[in-house]
């Protein structure tokens, strides 16, 4: 065993037992080559039955708990006023403190409703780093999604503890240059999915809120992975080591005016999301949009049993035994990959390991999409499906036919929650 291999810590013990299983099968390289050709080398076009280890996303791929499945049997499918809505309302209020919320079928629908209610053509929405659906929803409304990630977050080799932080000085300079009247809201994505799953510090959340509120600009979190971010704060930020994660989460939300959330991440379910806020006028507008796009405000495109599963999952995810396992098991894969000599974003994020395709494949220029090439090779050689987070996803086409490449060329290996064991990871 090499010195590098000896430094890799053991895989954490899973804090759960497995009750239901789903068969998967290994394919041959020849089979996978044919699959790739049929799919046009687009991994989104590959049928799930042809994937051995599917690390494309952690969204909606979690294994639900026995409590969540039991809750599904309590689904109240009344069109209006189902009891599951009020159970979810209680869960959201107890964790976030927000007074109002509307359920949606997933996170991008919550973004759609929010930006439809707030963004006018020509306005800008600053963030640490918008993910692709958030960016697309802002652009669809005629707005400009602006990324102001701190410089440390753009260096895959940096070991800074909070590489998801926004550059607060640049944020204030941007507000002054653009004009507060042209910024309907500001956002932070926690954790920063487009930038390596890196967390945002409490100090940065607080400072961002102070800057935005100084100019009367509402502040929203993209809270898909709020529990993972809260646990990183507990691990890495001075003063929080003894603070329960639920209290850290409440403090995170206390500096903001609302949030969007895909419940398919840190609510441990397969479908669902919500938009929450304190502004009653915004809530009323959101309800009107919801009825047109999603459904009545007490179901929002979801069955009652889905609402119940989300309510249970929002609290389950705050179990520190689970979070310890979740963060450490991701770090375990990162350590293994790094020990094998593959450049990755360091330190490991909460939900995924990000391979640095730009460093691994320096001979492939950005305009030939090195991260997409690497993702295809991972599937071709091992049957593992990841996803490109680079110029295919975030490149900006120009009128002259050229393209501004993404800041980083990454392949994300997102680990579904409570789904794979150490044998799969190894």
Residue ranges and their predicted role:
Residues 287-290, 307-316, 351-360, 406-412:
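Short acidic (Asp/Glu) and glycine-rich catalytic loops that position anionic groups and cofactors
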Residues 358-385, 399-406:
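Active-site loop ensemble at the mouth of alpha/beta enzyme cores that anchors a bound cofactor
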Residues 317, 393-426:
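PLP-dependent enzyme catalytic core of the Aspartate aminotransferase-like
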Residues 284, 362-370, 418-425:
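Short, conserved charged micro-motifs
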Residues 330-331, 345-357:
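Conserved glycine-rich beta-strand-loop-beta hairpin in the small C-terminal domain of fold type I
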Residues 169, 291-295, 384-398:
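Conserved alpha/beta core surface patches that mediate binding of polyanionic ligands
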Residues 75, 260, 412-416:
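Short glycine-rich or small-residue beta-strand-to-loop segments that form or flank ligand, phosphate
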Residues 2-41, 45-64, 68, 77-101, ...:
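Conserved PLP-enzyme active-site core in the AAT-like
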């Amino acid at each position: 065993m090499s010195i590098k291999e000896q430094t890799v810590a053991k895989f954490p013990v899973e804090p759960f037992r497995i009750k239901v299983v789903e068969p998967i099968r290994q394919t041959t390289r020849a089979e996978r080559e044919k699959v790739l050709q049929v799919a046009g080398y687009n991994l989104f076009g590959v049928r799930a039955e042809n994937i051995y280890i599917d690390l494309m996303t952690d969204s909606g791929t979690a294994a639900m708990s026995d409590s969540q499945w039991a809750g599904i049997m309590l689904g109240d499918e009344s069109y209006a006023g189902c009891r599951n809505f009020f159970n979810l309302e209680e869960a959201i209020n107890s964790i976030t403190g927000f007074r109002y919320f509307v359920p949606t079928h997933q996170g991008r629908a919550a973004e759609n409703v929010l930006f439809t209610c707030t963004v006018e053509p020509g306005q800008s929405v600053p963030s640490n780093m918008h993910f692709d659906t958030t960016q697309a929803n802002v652009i669809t409304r005629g707005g400009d999604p602006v990324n102001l990630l701190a410089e440390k977050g753009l260096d895959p080799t940096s070991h800074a503890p909070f590489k998801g932080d926004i550059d607060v000085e640049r944020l204030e300079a941007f507000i002054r240059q653009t004009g507060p009247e042209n910024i309907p809201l500001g956002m932070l994505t926690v954790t920063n999915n487009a930038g390596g799953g890196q967390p945002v510090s409490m100090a940065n959340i607080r400072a961002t809120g102070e800057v935005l509120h100084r100019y009367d600009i509402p502040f929203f979190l993209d809270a898909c992975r709020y529990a993972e971010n809260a646990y990183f704060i507990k691990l890495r930020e001075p003063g929080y080591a003894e603070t329960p994660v639920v209290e850290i989460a409440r403090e995170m939300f206390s500096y903001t005016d609302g949030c969007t959330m895909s419940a398919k991440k840190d609510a441990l379910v397969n479908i669902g999301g919500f938009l929450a806020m304190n502004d009653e006028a915004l809530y009323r507008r959101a309800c009107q949009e919801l009825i047109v796009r999603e459904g009545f405000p007490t179901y929002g495109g979801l069955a009652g049993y889905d609402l119940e599963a989300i309510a249970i999952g929002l609290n389950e995810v705050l179990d520190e035994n689970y979070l310890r396992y979740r963060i450490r098991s991701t770090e375990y894969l990162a350590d293994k990959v790094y020990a094998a000599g593959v450049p990755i974003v360091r330190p490991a994020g909460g939900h995924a390991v990000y391979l640095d395709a730009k460093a691994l494949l320096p001979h492939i220029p950005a305009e030939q999409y090195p991260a997409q090439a690497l993702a295809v090779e991972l599937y071709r050689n091992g049957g593992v499906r990841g996803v490109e987070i680079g110029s295919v996803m975030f490149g900006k086409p120009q009128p002259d036919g050229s393209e501004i490449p993404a800041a980083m060329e990454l392949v994300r290996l997102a680990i579904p929650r409570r789904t794979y064991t150490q044998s799969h990871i190894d």
